[in-house]
Each structure stands twice: as structure tokens, then as C-alpha cells.
């Protein structure tokens, strides 16, 4: 959530910044108008409360002196009514103000490419050239099906579209990938956490998914009243429980920066994705992802973003997967992010790079919503900065391995770093199948 004081004191700058993220200037004008009225009512209420205290003392004094206090009592009643009216208005205006603030995205960093969509993203660097073959490479969904290690048809029978079964070497490869990621992340100084996969609304609001993105997630409903959702949602990313671990907490400065990592399933409705990536592992309703989260001081967050991005790059490099890093435009960056780097891995069969990680600096945007603060050496409280990044999306990594390490005979060579995680298996060949 943005700081209303920053908007109030820098209205033109705020309009210019948020215009690059699709926010109309009238929305900020309305917000500041509400804020002005709210602060005026709050000041009047505080003045009347001070007056009520004075009148209360006068009444007590008159009663001690056995004097008539009826006029003062009547005045205090009228003051009380006015206070009640003003406080109600303040509450209503606060609710309106928060309604708008909770739906405004983060201010973009000055270094962000300006543009409405991903066509304005800018390549920052590239690692290795795209994989070349002496034969026409197969798509990972064909490889997985032919090898008998991925089964979308039976998953569709059981769960519907955008679900998959991993079988035999496929399941082993998926497990090898996320165990490798977790081991590498812990070597890089991250503490591993196994978080809850169901979170409450306050947590979803803390990281910015609610109230704006209800349609993108799966919420648990009450069996006795299906129209009434319970206060529980399946996590769309481990970022939610990891960041909210620190919600309403005060961290001592000497504990920062904090680095945590987790592997979890991620559940997404993929609202608005009809017709996109209908085959394969790229866009699923349920998938596994390893997440990295950092909590740090404001003056450290930009350096920490570079470290976070390099941590994610390190994983792709050890796997030998070609990729490039792109800086997202103001119109393509996520709601909570001030700056995002996407890592996109090369997919030979698609002949293009596909996102496998997003590394974002959310500055104090999430910390303000979730009240994540730290106490400095002088005892003063400050909002922390939060960062998050995929390290990495597991299913997409499996897809990239299948496509980049495929052989002409349809087998897939296991990347060297994964062989110990695959019980020594160096090549995936056709499975006999369960049925």
C-alpha cells in the first residue's frame, strides 16, 4: 500500500508515476479530496474532545462547589453528539480512503522501462546462446507423453484441464529439481521453511493479492453456505505465507537482511488465460515452485534485488539452461513491485524464451500493508522493504530440461548436477507405463 502522505505532498509526481501503471489522475484527486476531508473531521473531533475534557472538569468543579452545572452538562451532551457524528464520518472516510489505496499499485522505480505491456520490456543480459539441434526438437508435452513420464489425459479425467500426472522418472525429475533448488538456496544463505498452503484474507491482503485479485485464486467455501467463503485461500505462491510470517512483527535491525526459501504447490485459476498455453507445463492450475523472500532495510533493497536475481540465475547456470534477464516495463510489472527482473529460459520447440522466475523489489509496499517493521539502534521504528523471487518455477524448469536436453531418439539426458538427485540416472528413456 502506498503512503497517503507521499501522495498528498507530491500529488503531481504521484499522478505521473502511476499514470505509467494505468492509473487515471482523477483517482488520485478523489483520494486526496477524501484525505483532506478526513483530516479536517479528525482535527475537529480532537478539538471537541479536548473541549469535552475541559467542560467535564468544569462540571466536576461546579459539583464540588455545589453550584448549578446543568448548562455545562447540556453543553457536554451536545459536544458528545457532534463528536460521535464526526467520528462516524472519519470511519467512513477512512474506509473509502483505504478502498482506493488498497487498489493502487506500487510506484515504479525510475529505472523501469516505461510502457503499457511486455513489448516495452528491455533485455538486460543473456547467458549462453539458444540450444541448437541437428534435428527438429519436440515440445516438452510430446516428449513427456512419449516417454510415459507426463500424463495430461488422465489428469484431465480426474481434475480437468491444466493438471498433470508426473510418473516414474517424471516424478523423480520434478523432485530432483526442487530439492536441488532448495539445497542451492540454503547454500546461498536462505533459511528453508515449510509453510502452510492455506492462508487467511489478512495474509492475502498483506502481500497484495487481495482485494484486487480475488478471481485469480481458489478460496475455500463453507459447506453449509456455499455462497459464503471461509477466511482461507489456497496459496498462489509461497511468497504469501513467507512474507506474512513477519506480519505485525517488529524485527531488530541486527537481524536484517532476512532470507527465507520454501517449496510449495501454487494454485491459480488462470482467469483471463483462456486459449493461452493450453498444452504443456507452462500454465497450470496447480504447480510447484520454490520461492525466495528477503526482508531488509530500505537502503539495502536495491542491492538485495541484484543478489536475489543472481541467486535465481545461478540455478539456471548450474543446470546449463540458456536464459536472458529482462527488466519489466511499468505496465507489465506486478501490482506490488517497484522493479522486476524476469528470467526467461530458452524453450527450443517454441523457439522463444519463456518466464521461469520473477525477481521483485516491493520496497515498503507490502510492509505497510502487513505492518512489517524493524527497530534501529536508536530504538526508532521503520517499515522494512520486502523482496521476492522464484527460485525457480519447478514445472517450467522440468519443461526446459526436457526440451533443451532431448536427444534425437526421444530420450532426455539428465543435467549433471541432477544425477545425484536422480539416484544416478543419467538418461530418461521410455517408461513401460502403469497400464
Swiss-Prot record:
It is found in: Cytoplasm. Homodimer. The tRNA molecule binds across the dimer. Belongs to the class-II aminoacyl-tRNA synthetase family. Type-1 seryl-tRNA synthetase subfamily. CDD domains: SerRS_core. ATP binds at residues 268-270, 355-358. Catalyzes the attachment of serine to tRNA(Ser). Is also able to aminoacylate tRNA(Sec) with serine, to form the misacylated tRNA L-seryl-tRNA(Sec), which will be further converted into selenocysteinyl-tRNA(Sec). L-serine binds at residues 237-239, 291, 390. Keywords: Aminoacyl-tRNA synthetase, ATP-binding, Cytoplasm, Ligase, Nucleotide-binding, Protein biosynthesis. Its EC number is 6.1.1.11. It is an enzyme of class 6 (ligase). GO terms for molecular function: ATP binding; catalytic activity, acting on a protein; serine-tRNA ligase activity; transferase activity. This is Serine--tRNA ligase. One of its GO terms (biological process) is selenocysteine biosynthetic process. Pathway: Aminoacyl-tRNA biosynthesis; selenocysteinyl-tRNA(Sec) biosynthesis; L-seryl-tRNA(Sec) from L-serine and tRNA(Sec): step 1/1. It catalyses: tRNA(Ser) + L-serine + ATP = L-seryl-tRNA(Ser) + AMP + diphosphate + H(+); tRNA(Sec) + L-serine + ATP = L-seryl-tRNA(Sec) + AMP + diphosphate + H(+). It comes from the Bacteria.
Amino acid at each position: 500500500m502506498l503512503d497517503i502522505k507521499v501522495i498528498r505532498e507530491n500529488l503531481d509526481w504521484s499522478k505521473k508515476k502511476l499514470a505509467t501503471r494505468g492509473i487515471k489522475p482523477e483517482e488520485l484527486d478523489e483520494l486526496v479530496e477524501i484525505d483532506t476531508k478526513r483530516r479536517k473531521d479528525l482535527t475537529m473531533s480532537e478539538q471537541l474532545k479536548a473541549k469535552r475534557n475541559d467542560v467535564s472538569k468544569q462540571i466536576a468543579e461546579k459539583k464540588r462547589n455545589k453550584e448549578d452545572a446543568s448548562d455545562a452538562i447540556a453543553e457536554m451532551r451536545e459536544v458528545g453528539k457532534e463528536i460521535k457524528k464526526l467520528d462516524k464520518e472519519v470511519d467512513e472516510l477512512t474506509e473509502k480512503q483505504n478502498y482506493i489505496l488498497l487498489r493502487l499499485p506500487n510506484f515504479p522505480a525510475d529505472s523501469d522501462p516505461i510502457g503499457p505491456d511486455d513489448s516495452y520490456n528491455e533485455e538486460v543480459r543473456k547467458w549462453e546462446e539458444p540450444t541448437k539441434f541437428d534435428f527438429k526438437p519436440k515440445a516438452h508435452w510430446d516428449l513427456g507423453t512419449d516417454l510415459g513420464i507426463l500424463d495430461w489425459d488422465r489428469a484431465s479425467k480426474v481434475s480437468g484441464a491444466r493438471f498433470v500426472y508426473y510418473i516414474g522418472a517424471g516424478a523423480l525429475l520434478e523432485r530432483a529439481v526442487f530439492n536441488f533448488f532448495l539445497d542451492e538456496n540454503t547454500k546461498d544463505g536462505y533459511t528453508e521453511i515449510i509453510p502452510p498452503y492455506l492462508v487467511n484474507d489478512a495474509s492475502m491482503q498483506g502481500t497484495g493479492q487481495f482485494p484486487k485479485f480475488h478471481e485469480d485464486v481458489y478460496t475455500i467455501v463453507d459447506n453449509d453456505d456455499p455462497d459464503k467463503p471461509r477466511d482461507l485461500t489456497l496459496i498462489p505462491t509461497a511468497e504469501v505465507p513467507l512474507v506474512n510470517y513477519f506480519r505485525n512483527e517488529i524485527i531488530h535491525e541486527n537481524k536484517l537482511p532476512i532470507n527465507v526459501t520454501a517449496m510449495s504447490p501454487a494454485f491459480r485459476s488462470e482467469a483471463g488465460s483462456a486459449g493461452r498455453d493450453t498444452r504443456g507445463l507452462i500454465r497450470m492450475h496447480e504447480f510447484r515452485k520454490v520461492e525466495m523472500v528477503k526482508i531488509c532495510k530500505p537502503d539495502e533493497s536495491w542491492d538485495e534485488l541484484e543478489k536475489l536475481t543472481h541467486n535465481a540465475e545461478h540455478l539456471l547456470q548450474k543446470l546449463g539452461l540458456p536464459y536472458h534477464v529482462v527488466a519489466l516495463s511499468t505496465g507489465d510489472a506486478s501490482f506490488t513491485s517497484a522493479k522486476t527482473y524476469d528470467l526467461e529460459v530458452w524453450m527450443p520447440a517454441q523457439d522463444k524464451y519463456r518466464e521461469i522466475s520473477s525477481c521483485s523489489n516491493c520496497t515498503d509496499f507490502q510492509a505497510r500493508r502487513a505492518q512489517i517493521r524493524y527497530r534501529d539502534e536508536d530504538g526508532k521504528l521503520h517499515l522494512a522493504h520486502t523482496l521476492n523471487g522464484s527460485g525457480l518455477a519447478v514445472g517450467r524448469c522440468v519443461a526446459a530440461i526436457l526440451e533443451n536436453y532431448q536427444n534425437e531418439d526421444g530420450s532426455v539426458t539428465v543435467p549433471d548436477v541432477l544425477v545425484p538427485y536422480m539416484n544416478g540416472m543419467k538418461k530418461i528413456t521410455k517408461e513401460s507405463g502403469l497400464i
